[in-house]
Structure formats: structure tokens, C-alpha cells
Amino acid sequence: VPGACSTITEEEVKNIEAVLKEAEYVLLQLEVNQEANELVAELACKHGCKVIVNTAPYAPVTDEFLSKAYMVTPNEVEAEEITGVPVKDLESAKKAAAYFYDRGVKEVLITLGSRGVFVSSGGREEIIPCFKVEAVDTTGAGDAFNGGLLAALSEGRDIWEAVRFASGLAALSVQKMGTT
């Protein structure tokens, strides 16, 4: 149902608190209303659950909300909208990452489409190339990436291996029409 994510209530969020107590990660995206996202982030942090924010679809975010994020995963357009830095290469990606770090984020991934993924983690910053495929339909590639990322991290893979795995899933998702 279009727009259903914008109707999530405080009561519905509080109903998942027990899940957040047991979870290692929670993935938030900006299609959900801001109040619900902020409450999930607050509860997750309270219970030691790492908050990963997929900044899609773009919507303004507060510094307070970002301060609760362990990791952010914007694409290059979303990163520019949030930080004001046009992300075109490694150096500009580092500048955008600094914006997130200044707000308390611990790890920054910026997806760059066919150019790969900028990863900033533990003082190491680089662009990991993506798999070269013929893209037919990119709808849902970000969702595939983020789902793969969380699956790999939940299995205990390090961020570098998790990004490669997530990139592989995103590459698979774009090769046919309607793979979302």
C-alpha cells in the first residue's frame, strides 16, 4: 500500500522493543515517518542494537537522528542532499563522510552506482569496485544492497567482505526487469 510506512505509530514501534533487545542491527529507511524512525533509533541505542540508516528515499534528517546511527548508507545523490557535498570521487566522498562523522556516525558507506561503493570504516577509506554487469532495471538495487549488507554483517563478516557481498546482490538485482 503506497504510503503505508508513513503511518507507523508510536504504539507499533513500542511493540517491537523486545525484538530490538535481542537484535544486533536494525535497518531504518526514510520512507518511514520521522517520529517512528527516531523512536526506533532511540530504543535500539538503549538496548545496544546498532542503527543503520539507509537514507532513501531522501528526506531531511536531524543531527540528533544521525547521532544515533552507527552506520549510514546513502547513495551519492542522497549524500549530497544531506551533506551539501557533491560526491564525484574518493576525495569528495571523504568530505561527505566527515559530515556524518561530525554528527556521531561510526561507519559511512556511499553507493556510487556503476562506480562502486565508498567505504569509510576504522580510519580506512576506499572505493570498492562493483561487479560489472549489464543493468536493465536499477529499481530496488539499493534495497538489495542494504539487505545483503545486513545479512552479511549479521553472519559476522567484516564490513569489507559485507560490502562485496551486498554489491554482488545489487548486481544480480539489476540484470532483469522487475527484480524488486
Where in this protein do the model-derived segments appear?
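Ribokinase/PfkB-type carbohydrate-kinase core domain
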Residues: 1-73, 77-127
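Conserved phosphate-binding/catalytic region of the ribokinase-like
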Residues: 60-65, 90-180
